[in-house]
């Protein structure tokens, strides 16, 4: 897998530094209180269309996304070209990013379908160079939820943040991604992404990643 550019994390690292004091105070105030789960993915079993992760991301697709801080302020925008190659139950997904400040970055996910549990949830595991350990989660209905820790470089130290990542398929060619970013169990921001694939993306792919659009 290709190694994601370290500079890609600098913006999120700066945000975490700004939030660190607030987070520390809140963490002390909330010490001993367990965070509640966001939702039970099993409750989405009847939602349609059914998401098959490796099939949705096989081939060429594009995405548009934003990052907001915990107060809902827009901090960054980005666009992505994606290319997925499917080999049995394994998907290798290449992502190429352009951010609105001109920064370029890349990530390669290796995603394995592990099987289906007795509850009907299809289990997945994903690995990428900048993800600590492996992303773990499941799919049912039109939704996937997986969680993972990403290590960010800050002042020469590695700082872990947690991602609670949800994907909801809307129709054959559209899915919406919401990822909640937290530190010490306290949410510090969120990512929203719209994925476009298939015929809907045919007139868009590849997006220009030379520079951010000016008009």
Named regions from a protein language model:
Residues 55-67:
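Tryptophan-anchored aromatic micro-motifs
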